[in-house]
Structures are given as C-alpha cells and as structure tokens.
Amino acid sequence: MYRTLIIILFLWADTKLFSSEHSVNYSFTQLSIEQGLSQATVQSILLDHKGTLWIGTQNGLNSYTQEGIKTYLHHSDDPHSLPSNYINHLTEDSLGNLWIATPKGLALYDAEQDRFNTTISQAIYSSIKVKGGIWFGSENTIYCYDYHSKKTKIIHIKKQEKKKNINMVDYRIHKMVYPDKNKILVGTRRKGIYSYNCQTQQFSLFIPSSPNLLTSLYITLDQHIYTSFYGSGLYCYDQTGKIQEHYTQTNSGLNNNYILDITEHNGKLWLATDGSGINQFAPHTQQFSQLQHIVGDYSSLPVNSITLLYKDQEKNLWAGSVRGGIFCIKETYIKTYKDAVLNNPNGLSEKSIISLYEEKNGKVWIGTDGGGINLYDPSTDKFTHFPSTYGDKVISIAEISESELMVSLYTKGIFLFNKKTQQYRPFTIIDKETNYKECFYGYLPLANQVANNKIYIISRNAYAYNTHNHTFSKMQTDRHYDFSNNALCLSYSNDKFSLLKYAHQAFWVDQQNDSIRLLFELEKNETITSMSYDNNDIIWTGTDKGLGFFDLKSRKYHRIHTKLFNNISFLIADRKGRLWICAQNQLYSYIIKENKFTIWNSSDGFPSNEILFAYQKQSNKNYIYLGGSEGLVKINTNIPETETQIPEIYLSDILLNGSPYLKKIKENTINIPWNYNSLSIHLRIKNRDIFQKYLLRYIIESRSKQLIETYDPTLNLSSLSAGNYTIRVSCNTKDGNHTTPQKLINIIVTPPWYKTSWFIGIAAILFIITTAGIGYIYFRRKKKYMKGNMNHFLQAILNDILKNKEEKIPV
C-alpha cells in the first residue's frame, strides 16, 4: 500500500513539475523585413562585445543598434565590400574582431572605416576559438589564423590520394566544438564527426557518417554530445562516441524529425525544427514540449520554420527563421492577448476591452467594445466567444447567479445573460420609469459586483441590488453632493467597503449599510482616475497629475514624486506589496516598501497599450487582468524582482561635415573649425535588453550648462560658437532612475584666424609699436617745430635789439 502511495505521489509530483514547465510564458521581439532587415531568411546571428547585433541573411549583412538597422551588401566595384551577399556564418574572435563567412570568402570587418577586408577567398562555414587564434572550417580544410603572426596555416581532414578523388562538399565542416581542452570535434556534412587531437595534431573518426546531412552538433554542460541529421531526429552520445539515445517522432514527444539547430538554455535542450517551431527537451524527465506559431495567438512563436538558435553573452536566446527574420525569446510573467477571428479560441473576438469580471474559479468574463462577451479560462489559456452577443459594447459585467450575468450594454441598458443558452433577457431597474431615467437620460448604468449577493448599479443615481431577494435600495450620501456633471464610478471594492470616485473627490461606501461619505478630496483642478487598497490602511490614488496615497490612520494625503509619468489611467495593488500602474500607455510596477519603480516594455510582454479597465476587486488567484485598447493583459504576480542593470554608454562615431572624425580624437578631445557645417555624436548603449528604449540626458558644459533630453542616440551640434565644451551623458534604467553622467568628449571649437589669440596678440603688439612710432614721430616733429620757433623767436629778438641799437646811434 505504501509503495503504491509513493508511486502515486511521485507521478503526481512529476505531473505537477511537467505542467509547471508548460506554464512558462515567452515574449518574442521580432526583427524582419518590416523593421528593415535586408532579407527574411536568417543564416547567422551575433551580438558583439559592444552590444551591436549582427544578422547574416541570404541576401546581405545587417547590424542593429538603437539607431536602427544598417545593411551591408556586396558591390562588384568595391573591393572593401562583402565578398558575397549570402552569409554562412558570423563570429567574433577573442580580440573583438568581427569575421563574416560567405561562399566566396572570409571577410574581416574594419570598424573604424566601416568596411570589410577579404582575408580568405575560399568558402567558410564555421569557426572555433583556440588558444592564440581562431580556426575557420571550409571544405575538407581548416584555416588556422594566429593572432600574433597574423598568418594562416591550413589543416586537411582527409588528404588527397592520387588514385582516389575526394568529394570536398561531403567534407564540408559545418560545426566545430570542444569536448575537452585537448580535443576538437569536427562535424562534416556527410562523412561523420572527426576528433582532432590538439597535442598529436591528428584526426580520427569519432562518430561514423550517416546517410543524411549533419545539421547540428552540440555538447551540453554535463558533457553529453547531441547531434541531428536531416530528417533523422535527435541523437545522444557519451564522451566516447557511443550512442545513448535516439529520439524521433515515433518513440518520443518530439514533433518533428527535421532538426536544424541545437542549443542549451535554462537546463533544457532547445531544438530548432523545420516547420514545427521549437522543441524543448528536458533530459532529467525525458519530456518534450513545444513552442509553436498558433494562428490567432498574438503571443505565440512568430513562425514555425526555425533555422538556428543562438545564445549571446548576456544569456539572451535568439532564433533565426526561414521567412520571419529573427526574434529574441524571453521568459516573461506578462502576457498580452489580442483579437482573432470569431470562435477562434486563441484570441479575443475584439481586442478593445472595456469591462472584466473574475469568477471565484478564476475564469474571467470579458466585455469588449463591439465584440460582445468573451470568456477566458486560465487553466486552458483559451477563449470562448459568444456569437449571439457579437456587435455589443459590454460596458460592465457582474454575476447574478451561477447561471446568469448582469451586463450593461452601451445605449441599450442592462440585461441578464444566460451562460448556457447564451441569450439575453431584459432587466429593469426598479420600474420602467426609473429604468428609463437611469439608462437613457445621458448616463451609462454600470453594474459592479461588490459582494456575493450584492451588486451596485451606478448611473444617474446609485442603487444596491440584492441578488437573493431581488430588491433595490437607493444608496444614501451623508450630505448633498453635486453629481450633475457626471456619475459616480466604482474604483475599488472588498468585503468591507468600496471606493467611489467623482472628479477630484474620493468616497467611502460601508458595505453594511451602503452609505456614501466623503473620504478625501484634492484640488479641483486634479482628477482622480483610479484607487486601490493595499490592506495596510493605505488608499493608493492615481490622478491626472501623478501618484499619491491617503493614509486612513493619519487622514492625510501624500504624493509620490517621480518623473516617469504624470497621468495615471489605472492602478491596482497586488498581494505581494506592489502597485501596478498604467500611465501614458506604459506599464510600471512600484515596490511600496522600497519606493522603487520598474518599467515594463514589449520585450517583457507589455506592448504599448491604453488601459481602459482594471477589475476593482483583488483576485484570490495570482493574476491581475487589465483591459486595454490593444487587448487583454495578464500579469502573474509571482513575477520575480528584476535586478537593475546599469547600461554601458560609449562613443561609437563622430561625423564632422558628414565625414568620420573618430580617429582624430586625442586625449578624449577633438578640435573643430569655427565654420563647420555639421557635427554629430553617435552613441552605443550596451545592455541585456537591446530593444529597451533609453531616455538620454545630454549635458553640454561651457560658460553655461545646457540640458537636452531625447530618445535619439545621435546628438547633433550644428551651431557651437568658438570655445571649449564638455559633453556628458546619462540614461534611464529599468527602475526609472538615471545613471551617473559620464564624460563623452571634449570639443574645442577654434575661432577664425582673426579671432585667435596669436593674431590678437600680434595685432596688439603692432598697435603698440605703431602708436609708439606715431607718438615718437609726432614728438620729434613737435620738438623740431618748437626748436624752429625758438630760433625764430630768438632771431626776432636779436633783430629787434640790433634795430634798437641802430636807431640810438647818431648819424
């Protein structure tokens, strides 16, 4: 009996483990022709040490940075272009050099000149880093490049015999891997897998040839060797080359025998198949699971024909496809559902959602904006559409009984919807006259479930409806309030109280007597948009001016200051000490105790979405549902806290008058003439998530300080006057803070020659000399003039004396 119980428990645990493995969600961020890729069939992917993503296709090489996609092609009249547009393989050596392998040769990328130098004219298909160099696999040939000597030597797998010709294509080297530090496994196209001994420098056949082509060779962390041959499934070998397992469609959960690539990620083998998506294989359980493209499922794998899998140094997983470009695969706890054709269970009947209701069993009823009523079952991850309701705008949903829902339809009033018959029947608020006033006097009646037997119907007036005895009671206020401009709106509810909002006022509703009283109010120019309770006597409040909270103990309102957003559409508190905030089409979380924000973007599972509705009651499950104009958002609140990674910012290029100027930097300083036309500074930002958009803060320091905030990684400076400038930059992180500003470069704008110090100095000296010369000449002339005048004066006096004497002498 105990043995049977143990077996049952083991099987149950294994089933739970297996099912939990299948509950993982993934987001797929895609780059294809629509985003600017030169061609959709991807042959190779590489993320270099600077954070640039390189994509090799059958028609061109592409690089992706924050500035977008740049394409490189072969040009017959340019010796520094690619040898061929067909890219076989990309690799980066230990020195950070980028190598591009094509059928017409191997090229080395010159980053400074942004061009290519062809080093080998033969076709290259693979590579492996070795001590002191890098090896490249060709047809029956390995080219061994040495870093120190910069020379290449050649190794042949099979030597040519005089009487026997070798088919070089059969010995094409598709893959080279290390089983240990002294051995390299060399996988050929048709002639099996060879072992190369690095000490004896000899080849030996390790795994015999297969009738089919070798498509992949991979060694796991536990030293198992996995191979795939075209159409033959998956093979597993031990370290001696002895076969351990052979998995096919007939003897395992593998769904496709055509495996094109293998890699290891998060403890599983990931298998790229030709037509059936990606298979995940867990060696410890011997179980297979699949990621596939599902028509109508926005969050599924983009395409099913996968050519390659690549794990970069940041541990991101990438997939290349036959017709869909590349996509980054990221495990996520947020999933967005969009619309599908009617009765397709993989999506909504209409992506715009305006109401939600969650049952106790976790199923979610969804009111769409024109697509009627939908039902989502989280246990199956499927939707049910109700065609009889298609075309209706369902603005609220509540539960009358296990078999019926109370729904409010835009411009039609309130109805009861039978879950089984899928039909409506009319519902009257008190009597026909009251019903007409509440439904058709310019107000929209909203039915909100606040307790098991109670629904608040809020329109021109507010009513509490008892679902057991089918009675109405008008909800009373503690004093008169002017609700003439709009109706009250329920923002939050639990078993004890509810919260209503109206313009700048927040109201408290006691569940015992359904009385309404003012809780707090803000300035009249501020509108409350959402409220939520965190079970710690705090009412969190979102407004059109930001985030705040009302403390029920101190009866005071406090603001949370942040530059991340200012206009909140919805917020909701989970049971894990977090707020989920929807603002300006973005999603943020706020860890209350740590006062820490986190930004969630499309690679996390949340593309830009205007959230229109969030369910007012806290779920007993681990999910939060948000209804938006771009679909249903499902958040798993078990999401782990993300570690904030500080992005690396570095200078990638400088263009002066459109020409590269990076080489002219000396001691992080450049000199440019005063009459330049254009100056652009280009940045690269290296971070794990290369799709994250960064708000860059440029600081230009001179006699004064200028601040520029932009998402553009290119800073254009076209009108700097003569002087010295220091350019600093910082960017935002995932938690909403900014990095410490770092110096990018010093810029010296030299003035025109007539404004230079040397010219001004010489001019000053010449002015002084000229002035002194003129003064000296003037002095000399004046002195001479005065001397002449003196002589003339003395002569005149002498003449007068002589004349007087002559007059006195008698004749």
Residue ranges of each PLM-predicted region?
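Carboxylate-rich, polar loop motifs that coordinate divalent cations or form catalytic acidic clusters
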Residues: 1-750, 755-777
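Cytosolic signal-transmission helices at domain junctions
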Residues: 773-802
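Intracellular C-terminal tails of type I single-pass membrane proteins
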Residues: 803, 808-811
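A short secondary-structure junction motif
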Residues: 657-658, 800, 804
